[in-house]
Amino acid sequence: MNDTLAITYSTPARLSEAEKLARQMKLPLVSLNSTDYSFLLVFTPAHLELRSTGTKAPGPLYVDFLKGATAHRRLFGGGRSQLIVRAVGLKSHPHPTILDLTAGLGRDAFVLANLGCDVLMIERNPVIALLLRDGLERAQSVEWFKSLKLELIEIDAQIYLSTLKKQFDVIYMDPMYPIRKKSALVKKEMRILRRLVGADDDAPQLLALALKKAKHRVVIKRPRLSNPLPGPAPDVVYEGKSSRFDVYLLKPSS
């Protein structure tokens, strides 16, 4: 990480925060216009964002639960008619506990928390976890967000699962998959995330662990045309335009 990432700030008011993070992560503190690193974590007046450097770099990446695409999905995304809602089984269990093993930018977890689920997000990449935590903290400024059951732990998902004592109703995964071919349809944020964190090569191992730990079901989000993860075949598949949800139903313990 040290060869590709540095810390900076766009306003003097956030210099001390930038200095503190640089010390904590043992990363260089550089000027805002630096191009010596692949990525810059930038403290702006509004939020913490991740910028790619270079002439054809996409725009910045940050988490905002109150504005933009995430907020729009909350208001107009289809509510309980969404495929993810059917996949996690909200009709039979209206307020499940959900363990999201691959939190990323927190969008799916946010949708589920808005619908009454108690969601614990796991994110192993420290940079993505920083962006997500920044978004969570800023969203605490509004009352309705404070009422959501949405938490984050920065830890490797395999380590967390292997030591997990509590049983969650649903374990959810949206593993990063390798790029098969270049496409203009690949979103900006996905291109950045793939460059930063790579593919989740341990997804089959996570599935095997999740099947031992979940109470009711395990849900895997996959590209629509991709193969299921190695292991048992899913019991139910909910297919959308570009992605699908493979659902593994678990028998109650006797």
From Swiss-Prot:
Signal peptide: none annotated. It catalyses: guanosine(1516) in 16S rRNA + S-adenosyl-L-methionine = N(2)-methylguanosine(1516) in 16S rRNA + S-adenosyl-L-homocysteine + H(+). GO terms for biological process: rRNA base methylation. S-adenosyl-L-methionine binds at residues 107-108, 123-124, 174. InterPro entries: 16SrRNA_methylTrfase_J, SAM-dependent_MTases_sf. Disulfide bonds: none annotated. It is found in: Cytoplasm. It is an enzyme of class 2 (transferase). Its EC number is 2.1.1.242. GO terms for cellular component: cytoplasm. GO terms for molecular function: 16S rRNA (guanine(1516)-N(2))-methyltransferase activity. Specifically methylates the guanosine in position 1516 of 16S rRNA. This is Ribosomal RNA small subunit methyltransferase J. It comes from Coxiella burnetii (strain RSA 493 / Nine Mile phase I). The lineage of its organism: Bacteria, Pseudomonadati, Pseudomonadota, Gammaproteobacteria, Legionellales.
